[in-house]
């Protein structure tokens, strides 16, 4: 709370864990507790939540592509009873930023995307491909630069 009270920024991974699965998991309550805790101690604050989508082309290999997408800032309503609403707003915002493959078709969909070399870090490209339209971008190998990108 001290950082927030001094108009600092705090990075929180609200899902509370990581997974190789390309979908949004339930968000933990920690980020709303921090925001409302800071507001309780310092009511003149105007905290904002900025959704950040982080996606990897290859989770298990070095030198893969990483796409970081920032969403629009979401103001924290001063009323602490709105914490659940804030969580849902952030969850919805994240779904607009990252690839979110439904569980029901996950294995088939992911296999189809990878076999067709669709950039699985690009939400628009994935949605475009899944709509049945031809893709405009494919992931390219970096040739001799491979495995050097992460070591710079």
Where are the regions a protein language model picked out?
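Non-catalytic C-terminal accessory region of glycerolipid acyltransferases
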Residues: 1-152
